[in-house]
């Protein structure tokens, strides 16, 4: 095998169009991201059809910019990695079809990547010496998982949400208290002005041995609290609501992840996904893990949000295991972690 494996990666699962050039799964030469946040902000959330159209408008330019920034041409690329699920089906198809076209035209192998595996692999970019096994908490707008990474490309899901993802709950609560979209960063910001002990919202876990989560209950509790306040004509302290809600979510994320770590006897927790940028989650996880002698690994914000560099990293580890993807592959919007 060549000393350096160069992956061109494409990500379009939701509202970011991204392309990157990644060497050997850990070195990023370029990571171009065209965000649609301003486009969807006025709608209060991502509109799937609008997202797909925006991907179509910019994908060619984004891929070319990624190659140019890396000072590469397609001749320098060994394989093309692309997200094929989970995500919005229309958005996924834009990136997938573009990648398939490139693979067909150049004769380069295609490697389909699970978006969640991509989030986990973002840690290999930031932490060059990181190797499995370790625990990973994946928290984003559409996904919440506690994952035991046994080996490269080998996962065991120990806990997951049974309804809303953590990021989805953040967005819905932010909308309810008039903060707008995207909810996660706005709740994080206003929470710093609030009292996290002001309101006792329920914790988002189950009273059994499972490490699963349920965020629909806490979301409903917040909405009920707001409705009662409005019916009584009482003032609503948005900062207190945001801080109390955030604490109830973060506490169960941290507690369950530490329990998972102890059960598998691993001393590293890697965090992935957009909600990993939340300052309360970061601070609480680091503080509580320090008490248990567990190291916490959190990539920078650019690698926590959806980006193609993480897809390039995951594609590399698939490539060296000899895995290739047929050009007949289709988008799988509900793809499960570990499925191929």
Swiss-Prot record:
It is found in: Cytoplasm. GO terms for biological process: tRNA threonylcarbamoyladenosine modification. Its EC number is 2.3.1.234. Substrate binds at residues 138-142, 171, 184, 188, 278. One of its GO terms (molecular function) is iron ion binding. SUPFAM superfamilies: Actin-like ATPase domain (SSF53067). Keywords: Acyltransferase, Cytoplasm, Iron, Metal-binding, Transferase, tRNA processing. Its cofactor is Fe(2+). Fe cation binds at residues 115, 119, 306. InterPro entries: ATPase_NBD (IPR043129), Gcp-like_dom (IPR000905), KAE1/TsaD (IPR017861), TsaD (IPR022450). Pfam families: TsaD. Required for the formation of a threonylcarbamoyl group on adenosine at position 37 (t(6)A37) in tRNAs that read codons beginning with adenine. Is involved in the transfer of the threonylcarbamoyl moiety of threonylcarbamoyl-AMP (TC-AMP) to the N6 group of A37, together with TsaE and TsaB. TsaD likely plays a direct catalytic role in this reaction. PANTHER family: TRNA N6-ADENOSINE THREONYLCARBAMOYLTRANSFERASE, TRNA N6-ADENOSINE THREONYLCARBAMOYLTRANSFERASE, MITOCHONDRIAL. NCBIfam families: gcp_kae1 (TIGR00329), T6A_TsaD_YgjD (TIGR03723). Belongs to the KAE1 / TsaD family. This is tRNA N6-adenosine threonylcarbamoyltransferase. The gene is tsaD.
